[in-house]
């Protein structure tokens, strides 16, 4: 099968923002008809949208927040497992101020909750925030995007925390390496060692 890819994104979303009740035909439930080989789930734990609010419209906190993210993550895993799809749950790098994602421990628990090898947890910390510490910039190779004179920015300037070109590249490479190590993707299909990135 082939697909037409439309670039659509929203800022600050939670997992529940991507269900059909909130996104209509863009909901994750519609992926089932494609029977994807793999789901990669990566949410840092945002809780500012209406689907993450309590009955009074206030953002969920504490146990209610954790319970909601746990239930929503379970739902995504169940959607994937209906078609025998694999699921890689990705913990985001540590944020500015050394804040950890709100989903890391939930994601870490999923392979135990769903034994059988179709559900895996992966942390991007070693690639972007070694030792659990926020890193703004790092030494780099000329073949990596965003590398200027042997150094590149991993994250946006303060106060933002999103990934710059070098950070996004290392994030993606770390995930691909994990997929290859799991045997879920053929290494030859993703080999970019002979390509110089812009």
Language-model features and meaning:
Residues 1-2, 82, 113-116:
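Short, well-ordered coil/turn elements that cap or connect secondary structure elements
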Residues 5-9, 37-43, 85-91, 120-123, ...:
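Structural recognition of the beta-strand scaffold that forms the well-ordered cores
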Residues 15-16, 59-67, 77, 91-98, ...:
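Second-shell loop/turn segments in exported
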Residues 34-35, 83, 156:
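Residue-level preference for short coil/turn positions at secondary-structure junctions
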Residues 42-48, 76-107:
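Active-site segments of SGNH/GDSL-like serine hydrolases
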């Amino acid at each position: 099968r082939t697909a037409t890819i439309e670039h659509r994104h929203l800022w600050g979303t939670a997992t529940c923002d991507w269900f059909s009740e909130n996104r209509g035909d863009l909901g994750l439930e519609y992926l089932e008809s494609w029977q994807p080989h793999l789901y990669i789930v990566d949410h840092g734990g945002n809780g500012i949208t209406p689907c993450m609010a309590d009955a009074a419209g206030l953002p969920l906190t504490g146990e209610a927040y954790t319970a909601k993210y746990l239930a929503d993550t379970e739902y995504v895993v169940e959607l994937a497992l209906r078609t025998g799809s694999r699921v890689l749950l990705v913990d985001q790098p540590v944020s500015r101020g050394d804040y950890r994602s709100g989903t890391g421990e939930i994601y870490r628990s999923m392979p135990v909750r769903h034994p059988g090898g179709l559900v895996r947890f992966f942390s991007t910390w070693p690639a972007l925030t070694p030792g659990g510490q926020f890193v703004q910039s790092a030494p780099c190779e000329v073949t990596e995007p965003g590398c200027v004179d042997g150094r590149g920015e991993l994250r946006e300037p303060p106060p933002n925390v999103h990934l710059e070109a070098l950070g996004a590249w290392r994030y993606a490479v770390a995930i691909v390496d994990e997929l290859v190590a799991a045997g879920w993707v053929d290494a030859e299909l993703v080999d970019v060692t002979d390509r110089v990135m812009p």
